[in-house]
């Protein structure tokens, strides 16, 4: 449990993977591409920079606003502007980075006012009651496509990315 509040990304990754393994998603989700096709968003925000997600949203002309203190990139705003901007958010996507740096905790009141909040995995334990209580409506997680645990392990251990590999499918689960 102490690793879940670790400032080190490696320790947080281990702890979140363990928590997710102890409380896995038990329901079938909607494929991410199908879920994104149904988004009707004028104001979409991402808390924490997740490059593949930003690229995917831009490709779909969703034009997200990204709030992140770690990334100095065009189109990325500092997180301190979040409370001023998020009041009119249609969709709020929260990355694991926002969990690790505890930025999500400072946004709890705003999350409860936003009707569509997605917590982005991997490594999110399936605790629907807890997640709903803090204002989360959806959890997006990668799921291994095949029963090839060894292949998945080797791919991730070699530094592979779970975003763009045929071993994974992204699913969105409604709470």
Label every model-predicted segment:
Residues 118-175:
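C-terminal functional extensions of proteins
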Residues 49-52, 66-72, 122-126:
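Short, polar loop motifs at secondary-structure junctions
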Residues 28-32, 71-81, 99-101:
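Active-site glycine-rich loop that binds ribose-phosphate moieties when present
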Residues 56-85, 89-90:
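Histidine/lysine/aspartate-rich catalytic loop segments that bind and position anionic ligands
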Residues 56, 103-110, 130:
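A short acidic, amphipathic alpha-helical/loop segment
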């Amino acid at each position: 449990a102490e690793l879940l509040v670790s400032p080190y990304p490696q320790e947080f990754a281990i702890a979140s993977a363990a928590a997710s393994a102890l409380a896995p998603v038990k329901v079938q989700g909607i494929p991410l591409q199908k879920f994104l096709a149904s988004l009707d968003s004028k104001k979409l925000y991402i808390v924490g920079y997740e490059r593949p997600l930003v690229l995917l949203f831009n490709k779909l002309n969703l034009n997200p606003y990204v709030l992140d203190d770690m990334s100095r990139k065009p189109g990325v705003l500092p997180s301190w502007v979040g409370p001023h901007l998020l009041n009119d958010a249609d969709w709020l996507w929260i990355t694991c980075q926002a969990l690790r740096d505890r930025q999500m905790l400072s946004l709890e009141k705003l999350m409860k006012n936003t009707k569509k909040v997605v917590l982005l995995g991997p490594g999110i334990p399936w605790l629907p009651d807890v997640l709903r209580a803090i204002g989360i409506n959806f959890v997006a997680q990668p799921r291994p496509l095949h029963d090839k645990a060894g292949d998945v392990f080797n791919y991730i251990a070699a530094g592979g990315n779970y975003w763009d590999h045929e071993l994974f499918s992204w699913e969105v689960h409604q709470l």
